[in-house]
Amino acid sequence: MNKIVFAVIGAGWRAEFFLRIAAMLPDLFEVSRVLVRNEAKADRFQKKWGIPSVTTLDQFLEKRDYSYAIISVPWDANPNYIAEMSKQGIPVLAETPPAPDIDGLLKLHEELPSNAKVEIAEQYLYQPMHAARIRLARSGILGEVSHVQVSAAHGYHGISLIRELLGVGYEKAKITGHQLTSPIVKGPDRQGLPESEEKVQSVQELAIFQFGVKTAVFDFSNVQYFSWIRGDRILVRGDRGEIVNDEATYLKDFRTPITSLLRRIDTGHGGNLEGYAHRGIQFESEMIYENRFESGRLSDDEIAVATSMYKMGLYALDLGPSFYSFAKAAQDHYLSLMMKRSIKEGQEVVTEIMPWSSR
C-alpha cells in the first residue's frame, strides 16, 4: 500500500511518540502537519522535526492532505477535538481516554455522528507479548478462559487487557477495590536516573472484577512503569490450561499436561549481525506474533503505537476494520472510574450497561 499520511494535533511528550515512529518508518508513515497553539512552541517544533506546524484549527483544516488526524492533547481538551474532527468528516485516532469522566463520555457519545470514524490509541493490546497472550487465550488451547490477573498497566490500560484476555464485552460488573501503600527505594522516572538513594511510598491499586461467572484481578503500583524492582505479572486461566507470564501449561488430553514457553525472538544478540530488532513471539512450532515493523528497530511500546497507527491508516481508507473503537475505550475508562469509586468509598460498586454498548 501507499504511505499512510496523517496529521497531529498536540505537541506534548506523548505526541512525539507518533512523530518519532514516523521518522523511524519513513517508507510507511508520513506526517502532513502538526497543530501547535503556541506560536513560539510551533516554531521550535517545526525546527526540531522538520514538519510544517500551524497554530489555528482553520489552518489545520485548510488542506486535507492526510488520511486521519491523531489527537494528542490534555484530557479535558480531547472530547472537543474528537467531536470537531468527526463533524468535519475526518477520521480520528485519539489518545486515551476519549473524555475525562463519565459525564464527558456520555456527552461525547451523544455528539458523535453515527458514521464517525473514531478509534482510540490504546497500545497495550498490541505490545508483542500481550498480543501473543491474547492470541493464545483465544486459540482454545486453554479451554474456556474464566479468570485473569493483570499487573502491567494503570487504569483503563490494564482493564483493556483484562477485557481482551477474558473475552468480555459491555455487561454489568461488580467491582471491589482497595488501595495499599508500601515503602520502596525510588527508581528512574521520565526525567531520568535517580541522583541519590531515596525511599518513597508506592501506591498500589487492587481490585476484583466479577463479570458474571468470569472474574479478574487488577493490580498496579504507581512506580511500576519505571521501577527496576517492580515487575509485571500476567495470569490467564481456562479449564484446560493457564498462562503465567511467558509460560503456558495445558492439557493435551485429560492425563497429559504440556508446558511450553512463549519465546521472544530478537535479532542482533551475540554474533548475530542482522542488527537489533524484535522479530516475534514463538509458541512451540508456531510464530504466534510477528512484528511487521522489524525494519524500524522499535521498542515494544513503539511497536504497539505503530500498530495502532497502521490499523488506523487501513480503517480510514476503508481497507481494514475498526480495531479499538470509542465504545471500547469508553467502556474501559468507565470501568476504571468505577474501580476508583470503589477504592474511594471502600465498598463494592455495580456498573450499568452504558449507552455506547450498542454503538
What are these regions (language model features)?
Residues E198, I234-L235, R240-F323:
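C-terminal glycine/acidic-rich active-site capping loop/insertion
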Residues P52-R64:
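Short acidic low-complexity segments
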Residues M1-W49:
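N-terminal Rossmann-like dinucleotide-binding module
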Residues S72, E95, D219-F220, G238:
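Short, well-ordered coil/turn residues at beta-beta hairpins
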